[in-house]
Amino acid sequence: TGPIERNDTTTVKKHLNVLDANEKHIYISVSGAVLALAEQKYPDRDYSEMKKILSGQE
C-alpha cells in the first residue's frame, strides 16, 4: 500500500513487472481500493499517472 499512497509510480511499475498474470490481477484490484483511499486522504495529490499504470495504459 505504501507506494500507492506515496504516488511512487516507479515502485508500482517494478512490482507489476515481476508478477505473473494472476498476481498482477490481484495487485491491481487491491491497489484500486488503496488508490481510492489515498485520493480521499490526499486530495491535493495528482494520482493520474498512477491510474494510468494500474489501468494498463502506461
Predicted segments with their positions:
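NAD(P)-dependent Rossmann-like dehydrogenase/reductase catalytic/cofactor-binding core
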Residues: 1-58
